[in-house]
């Protein structure tokens, strides 16, 4: 498997610092993943498969998916986060391929995955490459903040890191949308499950 990336030392150090300062705050999977797994992933792939976890950090989603019997590739810019993921995985580490690199210029390789997922990460320019990484018949799971988050406490405020209303469904153009929701439940988010046609 080969990926092509660029480098961003400032961003890497920012995330390294976040993981060092709060190492135990990154482990509970977002509730969207277990729900999407039972409603969409499991019916399509009852015997498991491979997944790509974008900006997977300390491994909360990759480890959960590995617990369900999946093989997962976790990519994150933070060496600290990825090392925490490796340690947090324990014996499940043999089912997770850990990659430290910048995602801002990600290029999909010939390797495709049954599931590609990203939680609270937004780099619009690489969205087409993320879609390419989904195998035919596979799923894209995505959840991140919307512009409404700028008015709430916590979370990102930079508009470059926030979705416009309806934008996530537009970014998934060419995929069949199975689930889409924008909500204000403590955080302003959009979530999507979309399938690449066979």
Where are these regions (language model features)?
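Conserved SAM/SAH-binding beta-strand->alpha-helix loop
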Residues: 78-80
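A short, conserved alpha-helix within the catalytic core of class I
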Residues: 122-134
């Amino acid at each position: 498997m080969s990926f092509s990336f660029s480098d961003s030392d400032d961003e890497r150090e920012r995330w390294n610092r976040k993981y060092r300062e709060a190492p135990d705050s990154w482990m509970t999977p977002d509730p969207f993943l277990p729900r999407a797994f039972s409603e969409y992933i499991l019916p399509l792939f009852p015997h498991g498969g491979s997944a790509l976890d974008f900006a997977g950090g300390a491994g909360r989603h990759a480890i959960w998916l590995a617990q369900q019997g999946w093989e997962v590739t976790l990519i994150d810019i933070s060496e600290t986060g990825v090392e925490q993921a490796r340690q947090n995985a324990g014996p499940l580490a043999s089912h997770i391929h850990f990659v430290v690199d910048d995602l801002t210029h990600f290029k999909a390789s010939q390797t495709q995955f049954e599931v590609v997922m990203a939680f609270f990460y937004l780099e619009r320019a690489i969205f087409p490459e993320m879609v390419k990484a989904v195998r035919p018949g596979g799923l894209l799971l995505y959840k991140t903040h919307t512009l409404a988050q700028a008015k709430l406490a916590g979370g990102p405020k930079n508009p470059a890191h926030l979705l416009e209303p309806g934008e996530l469904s537009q970014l998934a153009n060419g995929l069949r949308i199975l689930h889409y929701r924008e909500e204000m439940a403590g955080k302003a988010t959009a979530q999507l499950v979309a399938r690449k046609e066979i």
